[in-house]
Swiss-Prot record:
InterPro entries: Aldolase_TIM, DUS-like_FMN-bd, DUS_fam, DusA, tRNA_hU_synthase_CS. The active site is at 100 (proton donor). This is tRNA-dihydrouridine(20/20a) synthase. It is an enzyme of class 1 (oxidoreductase). Catalyzes the synthesis of 5,6-dihydrouridine (D), a modified base found in the D-loop of most tRNAs, via the reduction of the C5-C6 double bond in target uridines. Specifically modifies U20 and U20a in tRNAs. HAMAP family: DusA_subfam. Pfam families: Dus.
């Protein structure tokens, strides 16, 4: 497990994307044990859930820092209210979702469809910036539907950075189809256009920009960093979290030893014990840990044992200890 480390680089140099149903608080706690410096994002949380919901949608562990809250919404006043609450809770950044293409999100008038209304996005960002001192950022695509020209993208960035005073953008290097494709298909079918994102950074050198989409290794991340201020990794970091073990050293220049996956599992035990005592099921935590040993002998046995046993009544850390033994036996 990496120790607290110091780096000359900002946290946004390498971040984990907000992913619905994946980057919950259990996932983020686990990922933090693999990298001290990586910027973590929550799942998208709607303004309606925060303002009217019964649960605590802003809950997180102090150990997760640096951590950003991604908001979904299009009402400037509601977003400002939620941003203020998030800052009071200690979040390090507020991010506005202008990239998710799902029907559920569009029906709520937020996500990628907002890209067609740059002035509204600017109003939303400005409303949040006016009430918080932490960074307010925007995650978006390179276009939507047939509005996919470079001129359209530049106009969007111009408006949101100018009238909205947004200083940082995370650009998913694909356009989004607002109808006809599922969210999963929208992550795979529209072609990646990294050169367009690089060009955007060159044309807006005063803005901070991170690139997202299809990045599968630290080598690829380092190549993107030749052109961009930051790199955001999504599915690969979730499905193969072991790649984060070297992030502090390779991306942030830390002298710390890379995180050891077995040590990371055992470092989870106090957190797991605490969560189990509060009624959390073991499987709700371990589902995020299934890919930890990918590429290591015993990975399949690890995944299978956890998948078959972590959901059972009374499952506790003994399940993890047994799964670790299966990995050790294969080494």
């Amino acid at each position: 497990m990496p120790a607290e480390s110091h780096t000359v680089y900002p946290a946004y140099r390498f971040s984990i994307a907000p992913m619905l149903d994946w980057t919950d608080r259990h996932c983020r706690y686990f990922l933090r044990l693999l990298s001290r410096n990586t910027l973590l994002y929550t799942e998208m949380v709607t303004t309606g859930a925060i303002i009217h919901g019964k649960g605590d949608y802003l809950a997180y562990s102090e150990e997760e820092h640096p951590v950003a809250l991604q908001l979904g919404g299009s009402d400037p006043a509601a977003l400002a209210q939620c941003a203020k609450l998030a800052e009071a809770r200690g979040y390090d950044e507020i991010n506005l979702n202008v990239g998710c293409p799902s029907d559920r999100v569009q029906n709520g008038m937020f996500g990628a469809c907002l890209m067609g209304n740059a002035q509204l996005v600017a109003d939303c960002v400005k409303a949040m910036r006016d009430v918080v001192s932490i960074p307010v950022t925007v995650k978006t695509r390179i276009g939507i539907d047939d509005q996919d020209s470079y001129e359209f993208l530049c106009d969007f960035i111009n408006t949101v950075s100018g009238k909205g005073e947004c200083e940082m953008f995370i650009i998913h290097a694909r356009k989004a189809w607002l109808s006809g494709l599922s969210p999963k298909e929208n992550r795979e079918i529209p072609p990646l256009d990294y050169p367009r994102v690089y060009q955007l950074k060159r044309d807006f050198p005063h803005l901070t920009m991170s690139i997202n989409g299809g990045i599968k290794s630290l080598e690829e991340a380092k190549a993107h960093l030749q052109h961009m201020d930051g790199v955001m990794v999504g599915r690969e970091a979730y499905q193969n979290p072991g790649i984060l073990a070297a992030v502090d050293r390779e991306i942030f220049g830390s002298s710390d030893t890379d995180a050891d996956p077995v040590a990371v599992v055992r470092a989870m035990y106090p957190y797991i014990e605490r969560e189990l005592s509060q009624g959390t099921y073991l499987g709700h935590i371990t589902r995020h840990m299934l890919g930890l040993f990918q590429g290591i002998p015993g990975a399949r046995q690890w995944r299978r044992y956890l998948s078959e046993n972590a959901h059972k009544a009374g499952a506790d850390i003994n399940v993890l200890e047994h799964a670790l033994k299966l990995v050790a036996d294969k080494r």
